[in-house]
Amino acid sequence: MFYKRDVSEYRQMAQGVRIKTLVFGEKTLLTEFRLEAGSTLPRHAHEHEQTGYLVSGSIQLTIGDQTYDAGPGDCWCIPGNVEHEGKTLADSVAIEVFSPVRKDYLPEAKR
């Protein structure tokens, strides 16, 4: 499966947080997050391992009890079932991979 970049199909996850599923396979799912300065992702946990790469901007991530300020080029790995949250310090773009596939992030036709 190949992905050709376009700006359609973003879904609003929270105020100032949009997500787009880029591509997925049997075991992984790749997403792009577009985050507006001041937006937050509340503390939560899920079964999926989550790895991320900050393309641009600045975010503050709390994973478990550790807090990190991430800038462009920084990466993270969140083990499954570990609580985490995020605060967007500047308009940002992040790429994240989830394993196993998050069914709630699949395009409507694939759920």
Outline where the language-model segments fall.
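A cytosolic small-molecule/anion-sensing beta-strand core signal
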Residues: V55-S56, G71-P72, A90
